């Protein structure tokens, strides 16, 4: 939602700038949201979008017939969606799913949000689309060039990534530091589930969250 209306509003007000210049947003009501990847997180996003009165489309390589969502092809989702949100895993099939070709199939003025995996998006071709004015806004919580310093304070250093510097230069792009998981409740759940599974393993009991190949 920060990509839709702009976090810039809050920043401007903190600087005593209460003008409306550059803050024009768009309504989500009666618009179409496209959810790519309809697992638990994707379906949670679908419910949020419905709360704003949006029509919701879904695309998944392995669609779940039990999901309450209108499944369409990827091309149909790209062509019809005003908001596209990525929630699929990064695999050989989904690597650079968002690229020059798929961007060309999107509506002009589309909003793109990626909170899943950076490699889903070809960043250079995304930047190309941003420069051409294809997007109303882009929100990125993940990006291709993430490294072991992603959670460090680099405010006093020079960015080594020209790609990140270019993304940050666009007024309609919002980048966050891969913090979608960073809530008190989520961290408590991670700790509890990890300890419960470790205890079950030690006792030779069934692992509720066992990972298998």
Q: What are the roles of these predicted feature ranges?
A:
Residues 13-18, 28, 97-98, 142, ...:
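Short clusters of hydrophobic/aromatic residues that line enzyme substrate/ligand-binding pockets
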Residues 109, 117-213:
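Rossmann-like dinucleotide-binding domain for NAD(H)/NADP(H)
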Residues 21-108:
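Rossmann-like dinucleotide/phosphate-binding beta-alpha-beta segment
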Residues 8-24, 200:
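A charged, well-structured terminal subsegment
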Residues 1-7:
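Short, small-residue-biased leader/transition segments that mark boundaries at the very start
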Residues 2, 52, 67, 169-170:
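Short, structured coil segments at secondary-structure junctions
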Residues 2, 45, 125-126:
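Aromatic/hydrophobic pocket-lining residues that form π-stacking "cages" and hydrophobic walls in ligand
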Residues 113:
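Glycine-rich nucleotide-phosphate-binding loops and adjacent flexible coil segments
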């Amino acid at each position: 939602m920060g990509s839709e209306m702009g976090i810039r509003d809050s920043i401007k007000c903190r600087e005593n700038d209460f003008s409306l210049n550059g803050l024009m947003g768009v309504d989500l009501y009666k618009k179409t949201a496209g959810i790519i990847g309809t697992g638990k997180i994707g379906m949670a996003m679908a419910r949020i979008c419905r709360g704003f009165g949006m029509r919701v489309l879904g695309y998944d390589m392995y669609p779940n017939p039990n999901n309450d969502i209108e499944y369409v092809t990827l091309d149909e989702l790209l062509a019809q969606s005003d908001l596209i949100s990525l929630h699929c895993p990064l695999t050989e099939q989904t690597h650079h799913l968002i690229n020059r070709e798929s961007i060309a199939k999107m509506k002009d003025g589309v909003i793109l949000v990626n909170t899943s995996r950076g490699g889903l998006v070809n960043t250079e071709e995304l930047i190309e689309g941003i420069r051409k004015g294809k997007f109303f806004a882009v929100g990125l919580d993940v990006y291709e060039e993430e490294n072991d310093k992603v959670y460090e304070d680099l405010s006093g250093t020079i960015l080594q990534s020209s790609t990140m510097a270019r993304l940050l230069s666009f007024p309609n792009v919002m980048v966050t530091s891969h913090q979608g998981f960073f809530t008190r409740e989520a961290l408590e759940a991670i700790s509890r589930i990890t300890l419960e599974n470790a205890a079950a393993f030690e006792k030779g009991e069934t692992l509720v969250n066992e990972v298998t190949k």
